Amino acid sequence: MNSFLRCVAAVLALCAAAPAPAQGAEEKDNIAGPYVPTPWVIVDEMLKLAGIRGEDVVYDLGSGDGRLVITAAKRFGARGVGVELQTELVELARIGAKHEGVADRVKFVQGDLFETDIKDASVVMLYLLPRFVTRLVPRLRAELRPGTRIVSHDYPLAPWPPDKELSMDVAEKEMISGTSWTRLYYYVVPARVQGVWELTLPRALADAPLVVQITQEPHAIGGLIHHGNAELFLRDLTVQGEGVRFGLLYRTRLIAFEGTVGGKTMTGEARAGSVREPWTARYLGPLQR
C-alpha cells in the first residue's frame, strides 16, 4: 500500500471513530453494513478471480475508499464505477482516483446501491452483509447482461449457487473483522430462458418442432416437453452466460445439445451418435401459471 493510501486509511479510521450523524430509518436501512476496508491481498484475489480485462466495466456496490475500482483501472486499464452511500467515502475515493492517475477511467457515485443503474457492468464486486447480498440477487439476475461476472467477498448470493469458490486465511483481516477466514464466491450471470420455446431439430432427429417449457430460478433450472402422452425432461440443463447445454432422450436416442442464447432465440449443434446437425429454438412466450 502506497503512502497516499496509508493516509486515506488513517483518515477513514478517524471518521469511523467520530460520532455518526443522525439518520432516518430508510437511509439507515440502506447502509449495507459498516465500512470495513477490504485487505489488499483480497483485492488482488477478487480481481484475479473475476478475470479483469481492459475492456471491462467494473462496478463496486458499496465501494468504500474505492480501492477495488481504482486498482482494476490502474492495473488492467478497466473502467469502473463505485457506488457508496456515505459522502465522505465517496470524496476519499475521488481523491484516490486522481492521485493514482485513473480519474478519467473511474467515477464514484454517492447513492443507494439498491437503486443504482447497473446494466452497463461487465463485472460486479460485493462486500456486504448477508441480508443485503441476498436482497440484491433478483436485481443482479434480472438487470445484468448474460455473462456478467460477480465476485462476493465472504457472503454467497443465496440461494444462487456459485460457479466457483475460493477460500484463504488473511492475517490482516483478523485485525479488521475479528477473523482471518475468507471466502470468495464467483458467479456468471445466466441468460434468461424461462418461458415456452419451440425447439426445431434437424429432420434426421425429429420430424416436427417440440414445445419446451423451461423454469428458471436462482437455485434450479429445468425443462419439460409434452410429447403425446409422454413427458420428456431436458437432462442436465445448464445455462452459463449465453451458453446453454442439455440432453434429451427422444425416440430412444440420446441427443446432446450445445448452443448460444441470443435474446429470444437459441442456436447450436445437436449430436446423436454420428449425427451432428444444427438446432434452433425460438421464444413463444411466458409460462402459463
Regions picked out by a protein language model, each given a short descriptive name:
Residues 66-70:
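Glycine-rich SAM-binding Motif I of class I
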Residues 20-56, 87-120:
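S-adenosyl-L-methionine
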Residues 156-198:
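Active-site capping/gating segments
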Residues 191-289:
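Central antiparallel beta-sheet cores of small beta-barrel/beta-sandwich binding domains
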Residues 79-84:
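Conserved SAM-binding motif I beta-strand of class I
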Residues 55-64:
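Conserved class I S-adenosyl-L-methionine
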